[in-house]
Amino acid sequence: MERSSLAVILAAGDSTRMKSSKSKVLHPVAGRPMIGHVVEAVAGAGVGAVALVVGRDADNVAAAASLKGLQVEAFLQKERKGTGHAVLAAREAIKRGFDDVIVAYGDVPLITSATLDRAREAIAAGADVAVIGFHTDRPTGYGRLLVENGELVAIREEKDATDEERKVTWCNSGLMAINGRNALDLLDRIGNSNVKGEYYLTDVVEIARSLGRRAIAIDAPEKELTGCNNRAELAFIERLWQERRRHELMVDGVSMIAPETVFLSFDTKIGQDVLIEPNVVFGPGVTIEPGAIVHAFSHLEGAHLAEGAVVGPFARLRPGANLHANAKVGNFCEVKKAEIGEGAKVNHLTYIGDAFVGAGSNIGAGAITCNYDGYNKSETRIGANSFIGSNSSLVAPVTIGERAYIASGSVITDDVPADALAFGRARQEVKPGRAVALRERAKAQKEAKKKSS
């Protein structure tokens, strides 16, 4: 029988050290609010319900924590009286009865489903409390996990630790799992007889043991448990996330020439044998099929590249850009809300927006689709195997038929039939010797200005 699980995610802090107009859990890591990463991790661990403890920016935090298919309920913590008090803000959710309760933090976005799974497994195996800890060579400031004969006997805060206990390098992350059937009994026994008068969640370890119940500690990588309190730590977490995701992609068959210069989003999907050159940035919503190439200094967001497509260098793909197989968008091009058909080429210095470019078509340098009249967007449709000459302007709405030719420098405002050749420019005139007269006149004007000044 599958075990039921509730995750209580604490996200009610004032975020003072972040020095921000919004809660720190709303700050993005890889293009997604921190809280969103935590919710995804608990969902991946099989959690069926989330109790989100909120304070500042409650509505925005709750919105950022929503995840399709997962029940997320927000509980307002009106007063800040410690972590134990924060968890009990979700009392109504806890008392519904779950096999296990996970306590996580909205500002620890690198936590993985695998680690949370292990905590749940420990509860399923008979422990009443499973605390997630980490080993570090810099334990100063952290609570220490005191273990005897494989059992966690206490979490000792540094200020209360003996000299011998301070030598312990296994530290408390704050995350834990609790037997859901006993959770309220344990939590309600937490007292506030301390200098700050607060209710500390860490007390559940000694409370459980005093009742003859088991508490254990499980280990996780220190980096995974990194918390965020200020902008410097946010940048560090971003770096750790990027390093981890790049490594995962490269192990899965993606080539990156200089991975440290590639920046991914939380939902970037890249297939095998894709080559990513240096200094590429992926915004949210990008999918790249096998065998595609993204050249250096390109920026992609909300785009899809089919097998064998080529982008860049110095290209920008905006939301709705869809490159079919073997299509190419080259240097200094921008594509937005446009289909680029199979084998079509948009090689350089071009803007294609709100458009359809048929298979095999060639878009010359400097050609643009004029899609906006100041009020409305309109579509440009270019048929298969058409040729759009350099420096042409296609004024939407307009349709270019299959195999049509547009002469260079044209301004096209009317539809062009298939197989037609269209010109939309003034006829060239040549006036022999006129350049000499123009130069003499300009020179005389310049001399006259000098004399008058």
UniProtKB/Swiss-Prot annotation:
In the N-terminal section; belongs to the N-acetylglucosamine-1-phosphate uridyltransferase family. It comes from Agrobacterium fabrum (strain C58 / ATCC 33970) (Agrobacterium tumefaciens (strain C58)). It catalyses: alpha-D-glucosamine 1-phosphate + acetyl-CoA = N-acetyl-alpha-D-glucosamine 1-phosphate + CoA + H(+); N-acetyl-alpha-D-glucosamine 1-phosphate + UTP + H(+) = UDP-N-acetyl-alpha-D-glucosamine + diphosphate. Catalyzes the last two sequential reactions in the de novo biosynthetic pathway for UDP-N-acetylglucosamine (UDP-GlcNAc). The C-terminal domain catalyzes the transfer of acetyl group from acetyl coenzyme A to glucosamine-1-phosphate (GlcN-1-P) to produce N-acetylglucosamine-1-phosphate (GlcNAc-1-P), which is converted into UDP-GlcNAc by the transfer of uridine 5-monophosphate (from uridine 5-triphosphate), a reaction catalyzed by the N-terminal domain. Mg(2+) binds at D107, N229. GO terms for biological process: cell morphogenesis; cell wall organization; lipid A biosynthetic process; peptidoglycan biosynthetic process; regulation of cell shape; UDP-N-acetylglucosamine biosynthetic process. Binds 1 Mg(2+) ion per subunit. Residues 1-231 are annotated as: Pyrophosphorylase. It holds the Pfam family NTP_transf_3. This is Bifunctional protein GlmU. CDD domains: GT2_GlmU_N_bac (cd02540), LbH_GlmU_C (cd03353). The active site is at H348 (proton acceptor). GO terms for cellular component: cytoplasm; membrane.
